[in-house]
Amino acid sequence: RRRHTRFRNVTGVQTCALPISGSILVSMASTKRAEIANFTGGEAAAITQQGNPYVFRTSFTQSTAMPKIANYIKDTVKAKVVDVVYVNNDFGKGGRDLIIKSLEARGIKIGADISSDPGQVDFSSVVIKAKQSNGDALFAYTNEEESARLLRELKKQGYSKPVIGETVLTSQKVIELAGDAANGAIAHVGLTADAPQPLVKKFDEAFQKEFKTRSDHNGLKGYIGMYTVKAVTEKVGKFDSKAFAAAMKNVSLSAKTTPGLLLDVSYDANGDLDRESYLTKVVNGKQVVSEILPPVNKK
């Protein structure tokens, strides 16, 4: 708490960044008082539902992502009953509520509704519950290390139904940790180094050359987020945190004029972003893009 109250006395700072839902939900009141724009990679829907004018996302809100996944489960997987595994934190509970709402709105029933703990190591009981439910597919919404452990346990117990998730499930880190147990996992992702767009490919090549590894979605979010700060600051014409936050409202930015954005992006009045996204599947240890999905508010 003492760390966050220090924002009140900071001067000359225009933006800050906090990565996950739990930390942004704690810090956002302090940065609001200090009138500092706060960028977050957190996906919890509650982040931008509180009317904080200084909060902006670098990833989709769960409210945007979950209907896209539910459409895929209904139209492509054609599942009638879906089991849900989620992590019991701000991130997981928000995702769980919205995927259930989105599935039920499409006539899909929920089978087992299974909570897991942050940092959980043993997923044997979770998988047993999913197998006993006998649903048509499993929706997994946990953090990266837990996702890898879940995938390994699913393979160990011979689970053969489709395993579907959002962003984390097919991320590079999960693939590395889960090994061949990640094969077949499907996810909607907002960003991936495997995207076919030329600017993303160029970023991927440069990142690998510099760091001898591939960037995951978090690296892309941070990179694009900072170029968003650059583009909007240039629009404002000066370093001014209040003017910057105001200029972020309903802004549309082009990757043609700011290549570091990699993709065209727009923000609404709440700080939620909109851009293209992807359906991915892990094939032979690699994330493969199967479909490019247009922005929700495509003009």
Language model regions located:
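Extracytosolic ligand-binding ectodomains
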Residues: 6-299
